[in-house]
């Protein structure tokens, strides 16, 4: 059933024009993009069902293959859904370019959507200028963080190449528990000493979870 089969007063397009985009529900906004539902459900009911079963956040995390497993979602609709969330991700990234870091919350917000597979542990380095604005970031390792996987020379070589004044370490804990392990503390200590020698300060080490973070600096561990 298509949008044109819905009563004119209830069509998302007409409601958008009449009341503005803010008046539309998430399902109605999604319906404007997908346009047609399934043989048994109109597009608004289809989108309401999608969001009820998966949530907007859940839909954003699904791969193209996983989206196509949902009844009524073929390749074209799966690509439309994926494209919407990818655009949102890129807009969020664009807003963070050259962002000034004033604390661990800024680091947490900057990293949202930048960790490619949150089921694995990733270590990133943020390179900052003299005003604590982000110059760039690089992925360093994937997998459980240990001192044997960390090569200070490579990290600080990259910092020098970026003309960075300081760096911040960031890594995720897939479990969601942001408390640092002994290995996390050891890695932080090694890189702080290396940074002190090169006069490139390690400003912080931030561990991120699902909706929380741990700052070594805030807990006086740096």
Curated annotation (Swiss-Prot):
One of its GO terms (biological process) is proteolysis. Disulfide bonds: none annotated. PROSITE patterns: MPN, UPF0758. SUPFAM superfamilies: JAB1/MPN domain (SSF102712), RuvA domain 2-like (SSF47781). A motif (JAMM motif) lies at residues 171-184. Transmembrane segments: none annotated. GO terms for molecular function: metal ion binding; metallopeptidase activity. Residues 100-222 form the MPN domain. Gene3D superfamilies: Cytidine Deaminase, domain 2. Zn(2+) binds at residues 171, 173, 184. Keywords: Hydrolase, Metal-binding, Metalloprotease, Protease, Zinc. NCBIfam families: PRK00024.1, radc. Belongs to the UPF0758 family. This is UPF0758 protein Cpar_0627.
């Amino acid at each position: 059933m298509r949008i044109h089969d819905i009563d004119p007063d209830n069509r998302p397009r007409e409601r958008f024009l009449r009341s503005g985009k803010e008046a539309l529900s998430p399902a109605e906004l999604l319906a404007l993009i997908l346009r047609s539902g399934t043989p048994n459900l109109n597009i608004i009911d289809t989108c309401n069902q999608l969001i009820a079963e998966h949530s907007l956040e859940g839909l954003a995390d699904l791969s193209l293959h996983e989206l196509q497993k949902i009844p009524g979602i073929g390749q074209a609709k799966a690509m439309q859904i994926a494209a919407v969330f990818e655009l949102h991700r890129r807009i969020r990234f664009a807003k963070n370019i050259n962002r000034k870091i004033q604390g661990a919350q800024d680091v947490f917000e900057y990293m949202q959507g930048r960790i490619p597979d949150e089921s694995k542990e990733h270590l990133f380095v943020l390179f900052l200028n003299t005003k604590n604005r982000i110059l760039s970031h690089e992925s360093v390792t994937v997998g459980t963080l240990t001192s044997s996987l960390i090569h200070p020379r490579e990290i600080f070589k990259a910092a020098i190449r970026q003309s960075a004044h300081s760096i911040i370490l960031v890594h995720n804990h897939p479990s969601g528990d942001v408390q640092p392990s002994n290995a996390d503390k050891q890695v932080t200590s090694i890189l702080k000493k290396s940074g002190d020698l090169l006069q490139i300060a390690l400003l912080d080490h931030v561990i991120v979870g699902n909706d929380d973070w741990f700052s070594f600096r805030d807990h006086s561990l740096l």
